[in-house]
Amino acid sequence: MARVKRGVVARRRHKKVLKAAKGYYGARSRVFRVAKQAVIKAGQYAYRDRRVKKRNFRALWITRINAQSRAEGLSYSRLIAGLKKASIALDRRVLADLAIHDKTAFAAIVAKAQEALAA
């Protein structure tokens, strides 16, 4: 049986990993063994942080909504309860956008929520 020389395959694999590690600091971008670990770890961070990003944005939206709704005289939790009671189905991303860019529309929504809570 013929001997298998894997020079081409190994070179291709090494090039792929080193290309993925381009821009990393020091040996992480030059030494295959270290670069391979760095690329794997970067992939783990990317996977985790794609999920964390969703949590962070939701927290940011809630903070923005709370700040603006308190300026209108209603806490965040009361606002959300009022919106549910008034069956206004706006998600937090849209509410946060309105709170920042269209304060009059947001004030109208808060007023609707207050009416629903009073009823």
UniProtKB/Swiss-Prot annotation:
A cellular-component GO term for this protein: ribosome
Zinc in keyword set: no
GO biological processes: ribosomal large subunit assembly; translation
Keywords: Ribonucleoprotein, Ribosomal protein, RNA-binding, rRNA-binding
Transmembrane segments: none
Superkingdom, natural source: Bacteria
Pfam entry (one): Ribosomal_L20
Database matches in InterPro entries: Ribosomal_bL20, RIBOSOMAL_L20_CS, Ribosomal_protein_bL20_C
CDD domains linked to this entry: Ribosomal_L20
GO MF assignments: rRNA binding; structural constituent of ribosome
Entry's family note: Belongs to the bacterial ribosomal protein bL20 family.
HAMAP family listed in its UniProt record: Ribosomal_bL20
Listed NCBIfam families: rplT_bact
Biological role stated in the UniProt entry: Binds directly to 23S ribosomal RNA and is necessary for the in vitro assembly process of the 50S ribosomal subunit. It is not involved in the protein synthesizing functions of that subunit.
Protein name: Large ribosomal subunit protein bL20
UniProt source species: Saccharophagus degradans (strain 2-40 / ATCC 43961 / DSM 17024)
